[in-house]
């Protein structure tokens, strides 16, 4: 099933050494989960490194770290209470500690092939620090890209506005750095709900962070872990070129049983592959968006038994035509059939397709968030106006001109004593109140 990432074979080798610079609560959690990925590579059990940068000191306590030697935490002193979803505070905190952050980057990421800045868009610390982190890595000539989560529509208006504001700034400068991987939280949330209907709400964060880490880790293994079946190959250097391509990067995966791959009648599985390409693993794309891609690649992995039957001229020709049809204007689009010699018995009949498409425009999901912001503002204005008018109408209709009758003054009566008449001018005039 497309996007259903399971743990890849433990014997795999990574293609590129990634470093993860986590910003804010969301970005730190993703970066830490990526650094938690394990392999059985000798002397490299934990192949990735992470630097976690945050204001709120309590957030660090929520993050699980399997190997402390691969993770560095930077507490932005003076901002321990957090940024309260105010990006200006997050930016100020990063700038104040930028020297310390950069020194840590030099130490921890010296041997890294590529750095991912991870951030949950919409908050204060990560969203605020993001542009300054981009400037820092850009000024010092690092190869880097962005791993950003998009908020769900259910988030508060301020969160949606913070996210779109940063996306606009990034889009204006996206040619200056590598790929942007967007994670649609709405998509992952729906997937989590479908797969775990009885799960607790707080389990989603752990699920999504692991899902993101698995997706990136698996594609980094595919390009370096299996035996090429033909001369066509998608190796680590080509993968590096893809993720260094400016624009948005889409990852996709599809698993099929070999009996679903009828090369005499390819329409069925090519349709499924096309749907997987558009659905993606982390966010949805549209066919028109794919057509504007700059680079694409398709890797196919199966067991030795199935490879000898499946990887014929007809099948590979169908794959080439399929990718050409979906990404017609790319600079490169290799088709790479692989053999997994360590396939488990239960997966001998499975064929896995992995695609990477780079240089894409911003997806429709960003436009949907902007539409949601507009809708909320319009409905809020209408609601406030309606309520305000109702109150004013009542207030102006209220008649407070009540005439009060002045009580007659009672005459005193002392019994048999002669009645004394009180003169009217002996009583002071009562001062009227004025409102």
Swiss-Prot record:
- GO biological process annotations for this chain's record? cell division; plasmid partitioning
Q: Where in the cell is it found?
A: Cytoplasm
- What UniProt keywords are attached to this protein's entry? Cytoplasm, GTP-binding, Hydrolase, Nucleotide-binding, Plasmid, Plasmid partition
Q: Which residues form a coiled coil?
A: none
* KW Transmembrane (keyword) present: no
Catalysed reaction(s)?
A: GTP + H2O = GDP + phosphate + H(+)
Q: List the disulfide bonds.
A: none
| SUPFAM superfamilies, sorted | Tubulin nucleotide-binding domain-like (SSF52490)
Q: Where is this region: Disordered?
A: 403-435
Its Gene Ontology cellular component terms are: cell division site; cytoplasm
Q: Where does this chain mainly localize? A: cytoplasm
What EC number(s) are associated with this protein in UniProt? 3.6.5.-
The keyword Nucleotide-binding belongs to this UniProt entry's keyword annotation: yes
Which one of the record's GO molecular function terms can you name?
GTPase activity
- Listed binding positions for GTP are 25-26, 124-126, 185, 209
Instruction: Tell me which family the UniProt entry assigns to this protein.
Output: Belongs to the FtsZ family. TubZ subfamily.
Q: How does it assemble?
A: Forms filaments. Binds to the TubR-tubC protein DNA complex.
* Entry function: A tubulin-like, filament forming GTPase; the motor component of the type III plasmid partition system which ensures correct segregation of the pBCXO1 plasmid. It is essential for plasmid replication. Binds GTP and forms filaments. The filaments seed from a DNA centromere-like site (tubC)-TubR complex which extends to surround the TubZ filaments. Highly dynamic filaments grow at the plus end and depolymerize at the minus end, a process called treadmilling. TubR-tubC complexes track the depolymerizing minus end of the filament, probably pulling plasmid within the cell.
Q: What does the domain comment read?
A: Consists of two domains: a nucleotide-binding N-terminus that hydrolyzes GTP and a C-terminus domain necessary for polymerization. The domains are bridged by a long, central helix. Interactions between the C-terminus and the following monomer drive polymerization.
* Name this protein carries in UniProt: Tubulin-like protein TubZ
> Which source organism?
Bacillus cereus
